[in-house]
Amino acid sequence: MSQAIPSSRVGVKINEWYKMIRQFSVPDAEILKAEVEQDIQQMEEDQDLLIYYSLMCFRHQLMLDYLEPGQTYGNRPTVTELLETIETPQKKLTGLLKYYSLFFRGMYEFDQKEYVEAIGYYREAEKELPIVSDEIEKAEFHFKVAEAYYHMKQTHVSMHHILQALDIYQNHPLYSIRTIQSLFVIAGNYDDFKHYDKALPHLEAALELAMDIQNDRFIAISLLNIANSYDRSGDDQMAVEHFQKAAKVSREKVPDLLPKVLFGLSWTLCKAGQTQKAFQFIEEGLDHITARSHKFYKELFLFLQAVYKETVDERKIHDLLSYFEKKNLHAYIEACSRSAAAVFESSCHFEQAAAFYRKVLKAQEDILKGECLYAY
């Protein structure tokens, strides 16, 4: 009978696997995952290591769902099925296992656009952060927290965390994708501060880095974010130009990104009064929505149709705003209500316009309250 493989040796390999996951290196991560699974069959009994393996399978699938949404890998369990395995461990987790369990669960909730839930898990994970010695893992934590607070429009908190993450990533060339993503978050925060002149250099730096590493997905996302920044600053012409560039790359290289790009393009055209052209892109966007992960963008396209068609569908607008309210997406409520108010105001329906402007003010108030997300 062959000698059992020490669990410590398998643990080292899982650490290497995680390193490849954090670098978004799918081929290397796949190879190491297969090697770990083979080693586990011959490994000495170690329940902690098996839990660590389950957590890493979950994190691996989160990476794949982000980079290759809709792609299937044989008969592997989905991220939702994997969630069940890490939610019911055989014993109470402590130390690093507890940290990873909370941190990865927060990432899952973030991907589901449940930002309040995500931040709740991140806050619990933060209590275990002192035991994390790996500098890159600390950067990962600060990046994910900054990303969540950015989406909740807690701008100062987001900026506090993202600058810590970027400071680490910039010293590690293998983490260029995380550097790009950190630049996105910084630029987004500057946009929220209405310092558009400070946002664009970060986005242009991200685009340059994405082109240097020849990553089509992040080239498209960089162009999309540049377009969004121009849109927020009121430069419709430059916004449409960059949306079109992002759409071209998306159609050719990253089709799963296309609905998001076409939504931004459609909304900018609608606000600019070019509704006929916008509705062509809305139809194209809806045609590309197949995956469950795109449900959010389907709702946004339906919002544009409800607001900008000849007869405004006020009931549909309220239904969609209720959908955003359930998810605490106050920034979307603010932006969508503002668009609806402007349309009603332009057609001299001042009562309806006033009602939607009140929703804008309420959303701004909710953003400032921040759901008490960092009240300890």
Please state what every model-predicted region is.
Residues 16, 57-59, 105, 145, ...:
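Structural register within alpha-helical repeat arrays
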Residues 5-6, 45-50, 93-100, 133-140, ...:
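Alpha-solenoid helical repeat architecture
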Residues 20, 61, 102, 109, ...:
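Residue at a conserved register position within TPR or TPR-like alpha-solenoid repeats
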Residues 159-229:
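Loop-centered beta-sheet repeat module
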Residues 244, 251-376:
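Long, ordered, amphipathic alpha-helical scaffolds
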Residues 1-105, 282, 324, 332-333, ...:
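Flexible inter-repeat linkers and adjacent short helices
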Residues 34-41, 77-91, 123-134, 163-174, ...:
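Amphipathic alpha-helical segments of tetratricopeptide repeats
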Residues 21-38, 66-85, 113-124, 154-164, ...:
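Helix-turn-helix repeat elements of alpha-solenoid scaffolds
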